[in-house]
Regions:
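Beta-rich, blade/repeat-based domains predominating
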Residues: 2-22, 27, 45-65, 78-83, ...
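A short loop-to-beta-strand structural motif that recurs across blades of beta-propeller domains
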Residues: 27-29, 82-85, 124-126, 171-173
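Short coil turn/linker residues within repeat-based beta-strand modules
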Residues: 34-36, 89-91, 122, 132, ...
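Short consensus segments that form the blades of beta-propeller domains
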Residues: 73-77
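Residue-level detector of beta-propeller blades
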Residues: 92-95, 138-141, 181
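Anionic-ligand-binding alpha/beta catalytic cores of soluble enzymes and soluble regulatory domains
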Residues: 116-118
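Short loop/turn segments immediately following beta-strands, especially the blade-tip
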Residues: 127-135
Length: 201
């Protein structure tokens, strides 16, 4: 649709509706297959979000998204941090992580026991255990990319084997579930995200 509100991260929820992180509109929108859309979330504790960047949906229907300040000027920032948020099925919104500088891509492990989140400012990827109540615990370094000059992590996806694919200016980094670097997939352009087809490719 046009205008798109500078949409970035996209994903489908469990009923096939499209969630879109709209930088320009400072919100996450939700749309049905016919194109009818509405605001899913645009504020936390009465203050506007920064500029939502990427979004994932848990099998419980909880929605997690990152909210860096990329799409706004510093003086427009109303939130006290660049947070990672969870919207529960009942509509309650919670800030689950508040110590990132610029949270960007995020992806679940195949069994949803781990949520990976990257910080483009610090050039690293962290892993968090996902508790039964949806909270994130035991945050730890998964991959430190700060030695790779232009290697700023962006959108991420996890395959069926649990390997993590992180896009960046150099291509697509691939890591196994233990955080070991497996290799770089070179591409002709600068990828901002990636996705899987029905055949797993």
């Amino acid at each position: 649709r046009e205008p798109s509100g500078n949409s970035n991260g996209l994903t489908l929820n469990r009923t096939g509706r499209l969630l879109a992180c709209e930088h320009g509109n400072r919100r996450v929108s939700i749309a049905d297959i016919g194109g009818t859309e509405e605001t899913f979330v645009d504020a936390y504790e009465g203050k506007k979000l920064n500029s939502p960047n990427d979004v994932v949906v848990h099998s419980s229907d909880a929605v997690y998204f990152t909210d860096p300040p990329y799409g706004i000027k510093p003086e427009q920032m109303e939130q006290p941090c660049a947070g990672v948020y969870r919207v529960d099925p009942d509509g309650a919104i919670r800030c689950v992580i508040a110590d990132f500088e610029k949270p960007n891509g995020l992806a679940f492990s195949p069994d949803e026991s781990v949520l990976y989140i990257d910080d483009s400012h610090h050039q690293h990827i962290r892993a968090f255990d996902v508790a039964a109540d949806g909270s994130l615990n035991n945050g730890r370094m998964f991959a430190d990319l700060s030695d790779d000059g232009d290697g700023v992590p962006d959108g991420m996806k996890v395959d069926q084997e649990g390997n993590l694919y992180a896009t960046n200016a150099l291509g697509i980094w691939v890591y196994n579930p233990a955080g070991d670097f497996l290799g770089l997939i070179s591409v002709p352009e600068v990828p901002a995200n990636c996705a899987w087809g029905e055949d797993g490719r």
